[in-house]
C-alpha cells in the first residue's frame, strides 16, 4: 500500500507557478478534509488514483493579469462483493447467494484559464475559457442463485455449476442468474465567457455586456448479457424455464447553449443605484440511443467470453448476421430538447457603512420544446 503527495512552487513579483501531484492506492481521491475517499465518501474495493496539477498566475500590477490551471486525474477500481442471505418472510427462494466482480478505470483532463485586461480606468475586459476531457471504462460479472434451503448444509460452493446441478437434483434450486457488462464513456466539454465593462463617467454609472457558451459531446457504449434459469417453472417444451437478454447500446449525446446579457447601472442618489439587466439564453440537447438486441440467439452464446475493457469485437464477432439486422427500433430512443429563456431584472441597490439593501423585480418568460421517438411512439 502507498500514499504519496508532492508539491513545488516558484514565485516572483509578477509570476507564480505551482505544481502538485498525488498517487495512492488507499482509496484517497486526493482531496483534503474528511475521511478517506474525499468529499465523495468512502469507496468500496481496491482503488488506486493519480493526480497531477499545474497552476499559473501572472499580474503586471498595471493593466493585465491572467491565471490558468491544468489537472489530470486517473483512477483504477477493483471491487468484489460476496453476499449470502436468508429471507425470513419469503416462502420460496428464502436463501440466496451472490458474487460480483467489477473493474473500473477513468482518465480526465480539466483546463481553465482567465484573462483580465484593463487598458484604462474606464474599460475592463475578461475572458474565461474551459475544457474538460473524460474517458471511463468498466466491466462487471455477476452470478447469483436462490434456494429453498440453506445450500451450505450441502456444499461449500453453492454457486459452482456442478454443485448447482446436485442441489437441483435434491429439489433445492429456485433460480440462477448470470450477467456480464462492459461499458465505455467518452466526453468532451468546452466552455467560454467574454465580458466587457465600460464606465460612463459619473461615479457608479456603467454598462456590462457578457456572452457565455458551452458545448458538450458525449458518447457511451455498453454490452450486457443476462441469463436466468427458473428451476421450478416449466417451459413450453417441458424443461426448466429460461430468460435471456443480450443487448448492445450506443448513445451519442450532444448539447450546447449560449447566453447574451446586457446590464446598465445608474446612480440615483448617494451610494444608491438602479440596475437594469436583460438576458437571453438558448440551450439544446440531443440524444440518440441505438439498441441492438441479440436475445433470439441461443442461450449461452456469449458465455465463453471474459469481459474486458472495450472488447466489443469479442461479442460482435459471434453474430451470424450483420449488426444492423439486430437493430431494435422499439428499444432505441431518440430525443431532442430545446429551451428558450429571457430574463429581465430591475433592481435597487443601497450601500451603507453598516448595512446593504437589494430589492428588485424579475420577469422570466420561457419556452421549451421536446421531441421523442421511443417504443414506437413519436412525441412532439
List each language-model region with its residue ranges.
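Primarily recognizes Gram-negative and organellar outer-membrane beta-barrels
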Residues: 1-2, 14-380
